[in-house]
Amino acid sequence: MLLAIDVGNTNTVLGAYEGPSLRQHWRIETSHTRTYDEYGILVRQLFQVAGLDPAAVTAVAVSSVVPPLAFTLEQMSLRYFKVKPLFVGPGVKTGMSILYENPREVGADRVVNAVAAFERWRCGLIVVDFGTATTFDAVSPKGEYLGGAICPGIAISMDALFRHASKLPRVEFQRPPHVIGKNTVASIQSGLVYGYVGLVDGICARMADELGFAPKVVATGGLAALIAGVSKTVSEVDEHLTLDGLRLLHERNR
């Protein structure tokens, strides 16, 4: 069994794979203060609650944008699963040419997403990942990573609005019934949802102009389904794209 771990700035997503099948997945808070023992005990408990045997784990693959947690997760893997983890980074076989000025600068999650998306759809595409930061990554029809864009995530945008506009109430991020809000809550929701959809559609349209072809636009991340339901450019949603990419990279680096 493969334990795939996607470490983001806010949340960490874990997946348990048997072959190509995702048996179970979990989302936990990314903690800089949690020790490797605490991570190990937590992950083993998650397995047990799901009816899975932690002893069945024979490999661990990690994508992380939080470098300080590398040692913690390595020790957790060694001590609690008796395996050396694969960290996505320089030297890992991706099967994809990285056409970036400095390939080492590309975040592990962005490479993993690009690999997974091209493996599944086999066409030129843009991957939009709604995380703490929202990332846009372009892949050529030949399967080359071309680069992309990074912008503040939805949660960051919301926090900035409420922090600097003290009279505005905090609202739930959900699609309002109309673009023209009839009350303060609906007006804020309209600005957040449709404003962010405008950002997504606008960046994807400009990228498509530069690419010179009509890319498939794939969304992943916690709010991907909501945005895709309103977006004019997002055509596919894959909640587990990053985990699937980790599984692919594990297979390519055995």
UniProtKB/Swiss-Prot annotation:
Metabolic or biological pathway: Cofactor biosynthesis; coenzyme A biosynthesis; CoA from (R)-pantothenate: step 1/5
Top EC group: transferase
Cofactor: NH4(+); K(+)
Residues annotated to bind substrate: 100, 107-110, 184
Domain of life per record: Bacteria
SUPFAM superfamilies reported in the protein's UniProt record: Actin-like ATPase domain
Chain ranges passing through the membrane: none
Pfam annotation, one family: Pan_kinase
Active site, renumbered: 109 (proton acceptor)
InterPro entries documented for this protein: ATPase_NBD, Type_III_PanK
Subcellular compartments: Cytoplasm
EC nos: 2.7.1.33
Main location group: cytoplasm
One GO term (biological process): coenzyme A biosynthetic process
Binding site for K(+): 129
Annotated keywords: ATP-binding, Coenzyme A biosynthesis, Cytoplasm, Kinase, Metal-binding, Nucleotide-binding, Potassium, Transferase
UniProt xrefs under PANTHER family: TYPE III PANTOTHENATE KINASE
Quaternary structure annotation from Swiss-Prot or TrEMBL: Homodimer.
Family: Belongs to the type III pantothenate kinase family.
Function: Catalyzes the phosphorylation of pantothenate (Pan), the first step in CoA biosynthesis.
Protein name: Type III pantothenate kinase
Gene encoding the protein: coaX
